[in-house]
Every structure is written in C-alpha cells, then in structure tokens.
Amino acid sequence: MASELDNLPVITTRREEAQGFLQGLVSKGLGWARKYSLFQYPFVTACCGMEFMTVASARYDLDRFGAALPRFSPRQADLLIVVGTVNCKQAPILRRVYEQIAEPKWVVAFGVCASSGGFYDNYATVQGIDRIVPVDVYIPGCPPRPEQVLDGIMLLQQKIQGQQHKLIDRKPLPVVGQEPISR
C-alpha cells in the first residue's frame, strides 16, 4: 500500500545535482586511473610461478596493461595475485597478506590450483582461495597460458573501471546555528 508521499516528485537543489555530476566525473576519472595503475603483489607458491614470470617478459609485456612491476610489500600493492597451490598452513599467511593490502584491493586466482585446489584433493590443501579471501577474477589453466593471464587482467580492468570510486568518505560537518555542537 503506497502512501501519497511516494508519488510526489523528488526535489533536488542545483548544489546536489552539481555534487552528483562532479562525483560521477571523479568516479570515472579514478576508475580510468586505477585501471592502468595496478600495483601487484604476487603470492607465488607452486609451479604456476614459472608461467607467471613469462607474462612479464617482453613477448607478452604486462606493463602495457599497467601491472608491470611487482611490489615486495603488501602495503604498497592493491592487486593480490595468488599463483599456485595454497596449503592449510599458508592460509593464515595469505589472509594476513590480504588484510595488509591497501584499499581498494583486488584478488586474482592464477591457475586451477588457486581457483579450486587443482588435483590436490587432500586434507592439507585449501580447495580454492575463495574460502580465505574474496576473489575478483579466476584465471583457469594448469598452468594458464600467458594469453589467458592477459585476458584475466583485462577483465579485472573492466571490473575496476565499472566500480563506483570516491575520493573521501567523510561525514559532513555540522553547520553553525543549526544545532549545538557537542564535543
């Protein structure tokens, strides 16, 4: 049962419209900038690491997608690439690395072992890293071909550009005279 208030037009001020327009432009600009400036932290644990190194070579050139140089501290990265099998003893380490990565952060599961445990179906292997950290893109293969990795990075870039990006998420300051300010 809808009330009469639901049918009334929404009235906005020019300032609210301008803020919405400006936020849209800022969001698109930040999406474009973040899309081409991925600071990766590779968490390499197994044989897929050899194929991962191939992607950075001159033939495939991951640098043209903005994800060239790996960071050696998770605090300097925004993209976690989990390469290979993760066992149960490594799971808390992976979780801690994920928590240390700067916001906004993205995760890529590289290879079938990181995606679903691979052919290691036993008590010591984590059956997919999505049980530990949220995953944005899965790259299949054992090991994945470099072309598949580039497709996965481009898919992640599309996802990043489509997200809503904000500069600062602050509460508005109270206006003097509206209500008393208590500290």
Swiss-Prot record:
Belongs to the complex I 20 kDa subunit family. [4Fe-4S] cluster binds at residues 47-48, 113, 142. It is an enzyme of class 7 (translocase). Its cofactor is [4Fe-4S] cluster. HAMAP family: NDH1_NuoB (MF_01356). Signal peptide: none annotated. Keywords: 4Fe-4S, Cell inner membrane, Cell membrane, Iron, Iron-sulfur, Membrane, Metal-binding, NAD, Quinone, Translocase, Transport, Ubiquinone. It is found in: Cell inner membrane. Its main location: membrane. One of its GO terms (cellular component) is plasma membrane. PROSITE patterns: COMPLEX1_20K (PS01150). The gene is nuoB2. NDH-1 is composed of 14 different subunits. Subunits NuoB, C, D, E, F, and G constitute the peripheral sector of the complex. Pfam families: Oxidored_q6 (PF01058). InterPro entries: NADH_UbQ_OxRdtase-like_20kDa (IPR006137), NADH_UQ_OxRdtase_20Kd_su (IPR006138). Its EC number is 7.1.1.-. It comes from the Bacteria. This is NADH-quinone oxidoreductase subunit B 2. GO terms for biological process: aerobic respiration; electron transport coupled proton transport. It is a peripheral membrane protein. SUPFAM superfamilies: HydA/Nqo6-like (SSF56770). PANTHER family: NADH DEHYDROGENASE (PTHR11995), NADH DEHYDROGENASE [UBIQUINONE] IRON-SULFUR PROTEIN 7, MITOCHONDRIAL (PTHR11995:SF14). Binds 1 [4Fe-4S] cluster. Transmembrane segments: none annotated. The lineage of its organism: Bacteria, Pseudomonadati, Myxococcota, Myxococcia, Myxococcales.
